[in-house]
A protein has these predicted regions:
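Histidine-centered catalytic micro-motifs
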Residues: 38-48, 201
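Conserved, mostly hydrophobic/aromatic
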Residues: 42, 102, 168, 232, ...
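Short aromatic-enriched loop/helix-cap "lid" or pocket-rim segments at secondary-structure transitions
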Residues: 49-54, 100, 128-129, 212-214, ...
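Short, electropositive alpha-helical surface patch
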Residues: 96-109, 195, 200-201, 253, ...
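Catalytic pocket-lining loop regions of alpha/beta-barrel enzymes
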Residues: 154-268
Length: 316
């Protein structure tokens, strides 16, 4: 999640520790190493060079929190936990529709990263823009009502948005939905209209952000499972439930989604750098899936920690 959403950033990140480990990235094992088999399906990154990669809406370097979270800094945290590949998510608050830094990361490390980018559905030919970004490693697109101040209720009905969904059915680029529980019925309708479009719902549709796991919200999320190309990111633990490790209160929700979608349509993700703020940390996030949930088989864990994200995002 990012600064567009009203979630409190409780504390600044421990950037010094991140920077210390980043120097080891250049000598790290290959992405397909047995030591780093897992995929983090959702992390943001940004550089401190705001002159080279300008921020939107008049923001300056002082607005970055943390001041730097580069791909090297991310991998310095991820690799010790067995994560060798990451799906990088465009930060709508800092760079919005300018995907340049993420594209640069893929250019430098084409085997390690894929991108969920953003295009402006209010501009002409967003479908053409999507197709142009596919060879650059952009295999999904973040769509969200939170960037729209006008026509918020109709965000899925705009012609450009409909074009994006149609294009995704052609290219396999996923529509990655950053939404609230109240947005689930609208997304469900779009899945009905575009049954061949891959759809990923981020962060459990933010169920539990207020500490409550409402049955009606979970029913609406599980209802989406009837569309065969939908999958769920089980992610952003820092923002849900008790919002602190060991995150065990999320297990009943994960089990319910496991029963509705099956392991082949669930994927773990950290939502860094926000998962490493305050009392939260990267290890606690991946450990919930890797080490703690007893109803998962070894093969299930392969899907949640690697195969689903590989299938959805690393196809090109």
């Amino acid at each position: 999640m990012n600064s567009v959403i009203s979630l409190t950033r409780r504390q600044a990140l421990m950037t010094g520790a991140i920077a210390l480990g980043a120097t080891a990235f250049a000598d790290a094992a290959p992405a397909d190493s047995n030591e780093t088999p897992w995929i983090d399906a959702h992390s943001h990154i940004w550089p401190p060079e705001t002159d080279k990669f300008p921020l939107v809406n008049g923001q300056t370097k002082q607005d970055l929190n943390p001041p730097s979270f580069t791909d090297d800094e991310l991998m310095a945290i991820a690799r010790p936990e067995g994560v060798g590949r990451v799906v990088l998510i465009q930060h709508s608050g800092y760079h919005l529709f300018d995907n340049s830094y993420l594209i640069d990361a893929v250019r430098r490390h084409p085997k390690l990263f894929r991108i969920v980018g953003m295009v402006d559905d209010q501009k002409p030919s967003p479908g053409k823009a999507m197709k142009g970004l596919l060879p650059l490693g952009v295999t999904g697109f973040r769509i969200t009502p939170f960037v729209r101040k006008e026509k918020l209720a109709e965000w899925l009905d705009e012609p450009g948005m409909i074009e994006m969904w149609k294009t995704g059915a052609e290219t396999r680029q996923a529509m990655c939905c950053l939404i609230n529980p109240s947005d689930l019925p609208g997304v469900d309708r779009m899945c009905e209209r575009h049954p061949d479009t891959p759809v990923v719902i981020d962060h459990f549709a933010r169920i539990g952000a207020d500490g409550q796991f409402r049955d009606e919200d979970l029913k609406n999320l599980c209802r989406v499972a009837r569309h065969k190309h939908t999958s769920i990111k089980i992610s952003a633990y820092y923002a849900l439930g008790e919002k602190k490790p060991p995150h065990l209160e999320l297990i009943p929700m994960i089990k319910r989604l496991y029963e509705a979608f099956g392991p082949q349509r669930l994927m773990w993700a950290s939502d860094c750098p926000y998962q490493i703020q305050g009392g939260n940390n990267y290890k606690a996030s991946i450990s919930l899936i890797r080490d703690r949930i007893d109803f998962l088989t070894p093969e299930d864990r392969q899907w949640l920690l690697r195969k689903t994200a590989e299938k959805v995002f690393f196809f090109a």
